[in-house]
Amino acid sequence: MQSHPLIFCITFCISIGLIFFPLNPQYTFRSVPHKYPRKKDEWDKIPIFAYADLHKKKLGWTELRYPSIFNKDEIDYILYDPEISYTYTGKEVVVSLGQYDSIFVSSDFKHKKAYNAKSHYLPHVRPVSQNLQIDLFKTIHDRGLQPHYHHLMYDKYRKVFYRFALMPDDNIKPFSNNPHQSFSIIILNKDYEIIGETKFPGNTYAHHLCFVGKKGLYISENNENNPQFDENKLVFRCFTLQGRKK
């Protein structure tokens, strides 16, 4: 029986550097190989993933690095938020950055290729540095005004990808679990070509609560701002792919 190493996504944390969040929470490893602040030409040296081979008891970095899309040096507490979402098809890993139009695809965790995955509801999105010394609530408010990509999902039943895009909103509620901002879902086929995009209203869905099933994409309606909200029920609406109207 062939074994494969566990793959870990690397998430940046200002206070301690890098943290590995594995698929199995039983294994947690920490390291600080890249300190703050970073230079704009250092990003292509920073790995996106680490791996753990439990048979060989070996930890290491993959050779898949961040793309060179950060155009300014970080200064003191003016830093980038390199948030990513990723999914794995069984053959390729697909990475989506929150502040970039394109997605990146790799089949060997070393080389990557960019594909356009821009929402036509948003302007072009590029990484924006943030001043972490200003008021936290203002930071959350300012981020709500920025176009932003959320999570990326792979639908193995229909061989498509769903990329969530959040619309700018001037009324973000800090620490709320009930986002009221509108969002869209960009649909890409197995060749990473955009085949459609659907916009959803705010105050209706909890876009961060979703999953893929045999019948379609399920998105939660458990949003307190939804007039039909019932705290005693967990409700998901199933969305299916429809052909384009001619």
Residue ranges and their predicted role:
Residues 1-54:
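Long, acidic/polar, low-complexity amphipathic helices and coiled-coil-like
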Residues 1-6, 58-79, 113-144, 199-204, ...:
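Surface-exposed loop and turn segments in beta-propeller and other repeat-based domains
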Residues 4-22, 26, 76-89, 144-157, ...:
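Structural signature of eukaryotic scaffold interfaces centered on beta-propeller domains
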Residues 19, 28, 93, 161-163, ...:
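Hydrophobic beta-strand positions that form the internal "hydrophobic ladder"
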Residues 22-44, 163-180, 222-236:
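Short, conserved, GDST-rich strand-edge loop motifs in beta-rich repeat architectures
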Residues 38-107:
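Loop-centered beta-sheet repeat module
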Residues 39-57, 101-104, 176-193, 232-245:
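Beta-propeller blade signature
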Residues 143-188:
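Loop/turn-rich, solvent-exposed surfaces of beta-rich toroidal or solenoidal domains
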